[in-house]
Amino acid sequence: MNATFRPKPAGSRWTDEQWKAIAAGGRDILVAAAAGSGKTAVLVERIIQKVTAEEGAVDIDRLLVVTFTNAAAAEMKARIGEALERELANRPHSLHLRRQLSLLNRASISTLHSFCLDVIRKYYYLLDLDPSFRIADETEIELLKEDVLEELLEEEYGKADNERFFAVVDAYTGDRSDAELQEMILALYEFSRSHPAPDEWLADLVSMYDVDEQTNVETLPPARYIAQHAAMELAAAKRFIGLALALAEKESGPKPYEKRLREDMDLIADLERRLSGSWDELYHALQSLSFGRLPPCRGDGFDAELIDEAKSLRDQAKKKIEALRDNVFSLHPSAWLRHMREMKPVVETIAALVRRFSAMFEAAKREKGIVDFSDLEHYCLRILRQYDPETGEWQPSSAALEYQAQFDEVLVDEYQDTNLVQETILQLVKKGSERTGNLFMVGDVKQSIYRFRLAEPMLFLDKYKRFTADGEAGGMKIDLASNFRSRAEVLDGTNFLFAQIMGEAVGEMVYDEAAQLKYGADYPEGTDAVPEVMIIDRQRTSEEDEEETAELEAAELESRLMAEKIKEIVSRPFYVYDRSSGQQRRAMYRDIVVLVRSMTNAPQMIEQLQAQGIPAAADLSSGYFQATEISVMLSLLKVIDNPYQDIPLAAVLRSPLFRFDENELAMIRLSDPKGTFFEALQAFCQKTAETGEEENAKEKAISFLNKLEEWRTMARRRSLADLIWQLYRDTQFYDFVGALPGGKQRQANLRALYDRARQYESTSFRGLFRFLRFIERLQERGDDLGAARPLGDQEDVVRVMTIHSSKGLEFPIVFLVGLARPFYTRDLHSPYLLDKELGFAARFVHPRLRISYPTLPLLAIQVKKRLELLAEEMRILYVALTRAKEKLYLLASVNDADKEIEKWKGVAAESGWLLPDDVRASARSYLDWIGRALIRHRDGRSLVEVNRPDEIASHPSVWRFEIVSAAKLRNAEVSTDREDGGALVALEQGRPVPTQGEWEEEARRRLLWRYRYGKETVVRAKQSVSELKEQQALFGEQADEWLPRKGTAPLFSRPRFMQEKTLTPAEKGTALHVVMRHLDLHAPMDESSIRSQIIRLVEKELLSAEQAETVDAAAIVAFFATDIGRRLCAAREVYREVPFSLGLPADELYGSEGMESGRRLLVQGVVDCVFADERGYVVIDYKTDEVTGRFAGQKEEATRFLLGRYGGQMRLYRRAIEQIWRVPVAECYLYSFDGEYFLAVE
């Protein structure tokens, strides 16, 4: 089947590649969209093109659109809705477009979890699942896991002849608890859920350990990764020897070394040959390995530096090979096999425990009628596929075939972040093969940074390698390389780095021409957009500065350097391009973001920036449990649960709640030195006081014990949330913390604790003890309850955020800091590791000697996981660099800059763009990659003079380097203090603060400034017609509700106890409107019939009995006795209570003064009635204002009042109907029920 492709319209704003992604079809399509390439816009346009095509258009509910987040789904729906509205404006009579707008809200545009939930709701009976199930809160799931796991282990401990289980417990738990085993079971369970068939995957774990003495180690799955690692290390050793040989061959080089170095080269070649053969031979070759001594270089013709460098290179080669000998190949292959055989029962036992836990956990969830997010995917999978015993394969079920028939195309956003389960679901609901399919995937594998959530970027990469540009062999791939976000300097710099560091062996993909970012924006010239690399050297200080410099953390040093640069940016000033105005403007603090790998040091960074006068903030969700007010309340709750806890009890007594001082606590302890502190407290209360000080302390202690008993009783009888709020009231702690610095945040923290308690009790769990245990579990895992403070886009502050949080965002100026911080590799050294392919691996623990050894699978997974970690870190670095629109700063702090540069020099002369695999694989930080790449650039000459390949040195990118000493940063801080000192002294002495003229003038300008568009500050972007009416008049049918009068000013709707009294005019008017909306127009219009219909509205609870009594049936009869009333009953089309939204120029509603030019407001309203007959469309609005009494029967005065009050409103109604419905309104009327007459509105 050939790929379908619609030609690009003339004058289209889309690039050729973008249009191809929009218009291509007929097969599975993978769009590799680089950062800033407009992938979301392309995806939305593809959907719009499909549903708005004049030929072959599809309904939007025949598309399945899968997004990564709910926010992305909402945004996509909004964009599609706006596009449909625009298209409808061009084709107002298109019923198809109107239908798409009506279908949009129920279209399948959602996260995959939401789609799975819809599938389960529809086919729950296939799972024997209670249809009233609910999605459990994370708290409830964690507590239920804990319960099930405890139950499982108790059963195992109680079994007789359970030797294998106890062997596992002895091997993998400590002496005091089995927490390590619990963590292992939960980790393996969670990991298994990322597989489409978790039970089968768990059962298959043992197969890798099914070996015997005759097995060849080199044929086992782990051996492939060990061999790849060994080959990389041998290649590195060969490279070092080659460099040493090149030095020996130089005119003044160590020529006597040449023979020995060639022997070394032969030795390495022999090891490489053996690596691809028998590992038995390789083992013996490595164990018998011996490097000969280098011969001496006698005489004066040798360069000492070249001799030392050659020796160093050979030593590096020797270390590589010796590391292989002493680690990977330290055991004979037969020993590896023996360990694997002995591990087999261990793996079988652990896998069986996890499978039992899985079954028990699912049963517990079913019993409670709950599911978790993992269940959504797996239950959906059970519905969509069925096992075929004849072929031994899974096939789409009848439900899956229904979805295949339902959806004309399946579109997936952020495809690089899908996992194997999600991929399986997508494959089941799509049609056909890759060559004939309807799966459209868009993403950027270089931005796949969620492997820790078990995302699988290899799914994207595998397709990218298989698919072709023309799609003839199968699926089609389309590269979107044009970046419309960043300046050319940022893109060139990013390309220069990644062309050198990202490769297939280390990085999982090649950063080739197709992957490189291409400049597609249209920035004006004149901005200094050169990326800057700033390295803080801690050792470049004078002797007396060493102690202070050593105390400064890297984050603080980098923050001080950032502060200097940010001050320059704002004051110099630095200009950024504002796309909304199309003009350059001065950079503001909000244009700047600081990106960090983790938020560990973010509070210190913010503190440093603020100390330098720079407003800075972060969405911090950590530090909640460390907050004083939360620590105190949790201690109090622990004491209420169990007062025999010394530390919480002492913390509560010492806290502001009870204010015991150190002397009083000492008195209490002396009352019973050996018992618990609570026992000492009880003894102290029974003791006779000997001094006034003791008497005072005793009164406080007795008061505390009385309160504690009261609270303990309350904890048994009332809800947890009630208890916590009562504690706030009894102790007045909530009010107390509100008066402290940061009081609002502290009170918000206490409210969050209360809310969390309520949330906890909404689950199937209860009780203070369980809640405290849950909190402890959160703290043990490093989780936090703190809600991040959302920052508005317009807050003029420097933002500090993680690279992960920045994904999908863009900022004019980016500071990427902490580049020398080591990668987090601690997980690689865990006693056990998990891998989708290699399964489960752990250290072998000798049952008698209690000595542990790494097993071959464990080593293999370590090697594999390290490469995966490095690939992930490369992608995270790519995301960070591509957030910058105009300026990029890279910051690092190192112990010795000279030593770092010396390390980088080793690769400066390497030929070819890609740095050697071993160099990239040995990186311990981002700086290790960046430094080695940039040293090869021509601008690296400012750091060191070395030979550089011309092709690389002449790259069009431009860089600026700066080495900054820590002493300079410290001195800068001192000088700042001195500048402020004069002002501080003046203030202390009560004298005027000396100011410079320009600052005084600036202060005056700011204080006297008035906002140009002041009127806009009191005008909302969305206005109802009623609000517009009330802003233009002082009384009407709702006057009693809003008009301030002497003695009363109702602000809220009336409470229930007042509703027994007489209804207000507005409430009576509302009741009449309800009747007019629901009247049967084909029924007789007499009082009896209308009364009967009103009674039915009361029975349907659309009206209260009190409201019904106020409705004047005779007035309604009078309305329908008119000519227009009769026309309404006979009309071919009748619409009642018609809502509308209409965008209008603000100056048209409020006048141009005080309003921004071009500002539009959204006006909303509801038209009481619209009908159409042979004369055209008629608009009617009912009014219940009292006019007969007010104007003493003077109809002309009443008419003038009503038209003056409501004429503008009616003209808006007419305009809305005409613009939105695209039909002319022939007649427009007000009807006054009080006067029983119509008023025509022109």
Curated annotation (Swiss-Prot):
GO CC term (a single one): DNA helicase complex
Gene Ontology molecular function, alphabetical: 3'-5' DNA helicase activity; 3'-5' exonuclease activity; ATP binding; ATP hydrolysis activity; double-stranded DNA binding
Function recorded in the entry: The heterodimer acts as both an ATP-dependent DNA helicase and an ATP-dependent, dual-direction single-stranded exonuclease. Recognizes the chi site generating a DNA molecule suitable for the initiation of homologous recombination. The AddA nuclease domain is required for chi fragment generation; this subunit has the helicase and 3' -> 5' nuclease activities.
InterPro entries the record matches: AddA, DNA_helicase_UvrD-like_C, DNA_helicase_UvrD/REP, P-loop_NTPase, PDDEXK-like_dom_sf, PDDEXK_AddAB-type, Restrct_endonuc-II-like, UvrD-like_ATP-bd
Keywords assigned by UniProt, alphabetized: ATP-binding, DNA damage, DNA repair, DNA-binding, Exonuclease, Helicase, Hydrolase, Isomerase, Nuclease, Nucleotide-binding
Catalytic reaction annotation: Couples ATP hydrolysis with the unwinding of duplex DNA by translocating in the 3'-5' direction; ATP + H2O = ADP + phosphate + H(+)
Ligand binding (ATP): A33, A34, A35, G36, S37, G38, K39, T40
Biological process according to GO: double-strand break repair via homologous recombination
Domain UvrD-like helicase C-terminal residue range list: 514-808
Cofactor: Mg(2+)
Keyword Nucleotide-binding included in the entry's annotation: yes
Protein name: ATP-dependent helicase/nuclease subunit A
Protein's UniProt keywords contain DNA repair: yes
Subunit-structure text: Heterodimer of AddA and AddB/RexB.
Gene giving rise to this polypeptide: addA
Family in the record: Belongs to the helicase family. AddA subfamily.
Record EC number: 3.1.-.-, 5.6.2.4
Positions of the UvrD-like helicase ATP-binding domain: 12-487
